[in-house]
Every structure is written in structure tokens, then in C-alpha cells.
């Protein structure tokens, strides 16, 4: 099961899944992707 959370460190509009994922990894998540203009972090629960 995936747990999703808005990124707390990502600033600005999200246009790159790679940038979002890199920021999410610094927050303890395994991956991340853009959802609209927001960066959402994902990890296994």
C-alpha cells in the first residue's frame, strides 16, 4: 500500500517528476511525482 503526502520542502510549481522525487527522498520517501503543479511524495506503508 502506498502512503502519499504533500512535499514540505518542494517549493514552486512541480513540472519535473525527477526533481520532485529527489526532494521527496530527502524527506524520507522512496519516490515522488507531480500531481498537477504540486509535488506529492510516496512511500510504502
Swiss-Prot record:
Q: Does the keyword Chloroplast apply?
A: no
Spell out the disulfide connections: 3-45, 14-34, 20-39, 24-41
Q: Which UniProt keywords apply?
A: Antimicrobial, Disulfide bond, Fungicide, Plant defense
Say if the entry is tagged with keyword Oxidoreductase. no
Instruction: Return the PROSITE patterns for the record.
Output: GAMMA_THIONIN (PS00940)
Q: Which Gene3D superfamilies match?
A: Knottin, scorpion toxin-like
- GO biological process assignments: defense response to fungus; killing of cells of another organism
Entry's family note: Belongs to the DEFL family.
Function noted in UniProt = Plant defense peptide.
Q: What is this protein called?
A: Defensin Tk-AMP-D3
Q: Which organism is it from?
A: Triticum kiharae
